[in-house]
Design a protein with these regions (language model features):
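Acidic, metal/ion-coordinating pockets
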Residues: 24-263
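Gram-positive cell-envelope targeting signals
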Residues: 1-30, 36-37
């Protein structure tokens, strides 16, 4: 797996095997698409068949720092059992799809950073990022309320850890594109409500994805009330905005269980 970087922004491009051909990931800011993606957009699609995308919802690779040495906690369990352990029972499912998406909550860093004052702050070692590709996960959403648990420095470390592990990501500033044989799927994300500024930014991202040739845009929405069966008015509003801006599919989390669908 290889990573490429664009000059003006972090632009990860991870090569992976897909049916004997190569699929690629691109991560970039809306106003700075990588040249390689623009070249790929000129290809005539020869793809036939289906693309299978799995959405796993909230995922934390670590936990509260005070529990880092707990034998039963995530950190010590992963160190003891191996980095392939967390997704072991999902391996057959995730290895059989084309794209697996998680909402990555928490920070991946090896530095001692000041935590933001809040109820829960999640973090794990930087090399925990490799848990994702070992488990068949190619894409991480970072639009949530835990990516800044250790401030901007922790967030930057998380992005770097994912890039080093060959995992693509999307957030408020970056979109992700999966490209294979002329087919392109774009991914965007949001957390909770969409302010006027956030709406403007999201529209620019979706416009950019269409301009580079994405035939499908997926929006990942982190919003709602945990353990409630029905979507909240906030979720419905954000989903409607995303569709109006160009999303073909909106996937919500983190209610912790399945909710209603609207087709």
């Amino acid at each position: 797996m290889r990573i490429r970087y664009a000059a003006a922004c972090l632009a990860a491009c991870a090569a992976l095997s897909l049916g004997g051909a190569r699929a690629e990931w691109y991560v970039f800011e809306a106003d700075n698409p990588p040249e390689a993606l623009l070249d790929a957009a000129m290809q005539v699609s020869g793809f036939t068949g289906e693309v299978t995308v799995s959405f796993l919802g909230d995922c934390t690779l670590g936990g509260e720092s005070k529990a880092a040495n707990s034998r039963g906690g995530f950190v010590q369990t992963a160190l003891r059992e191996g980095y392939d352990y967390p997704f072991l029972n999902l391996q057959s499912l995730l290895d059989g799809d084309d794209v697996t998406v998680v909402n990555l909550e928490g920070v991946l860093t090896d530095r001692t950073l000041d935590r933001v004052k809040k109820t829960f702050n999640f973090k794990g070692p930087a090399d925990f990022a490799t848990i994702l590709p070992l488990g068949g996960v190619e894409l991480a959403g970072l639009s949530n309320n835990h990516t800044l648990d250790y401030g901007a420095e922790g967030y930057a470390d998380t992005q770097a850890a994912l890039a080093d592990a060959g995992v693509a990501y999307f957030d408020a500033d970056h979109v992700a594109v999966w490209a294979h044989d002329g087919v392109m799927i774009g991914f965007t994300g949001s957390a909770f409500s969409l302010s006027t500024g956030a709406q403007k930014n999201l529209r620019a991202q979706m416009d950019a994805l269409r301009e580079v040739g994405c035939q499908l845009i997926v929006h990942s929405m982190h919003a709602g009330t945990e353990y409630e069966r029905e979507p909240t008015s906030q979720q419905k509003t954000v989903a409607a905005h995303a569709v109006d801006m160009g999303a073909d599919l909106v996937v919500g989390h983190p209610p912790m269980w399945c909710r209603a669908t609207n087709c």
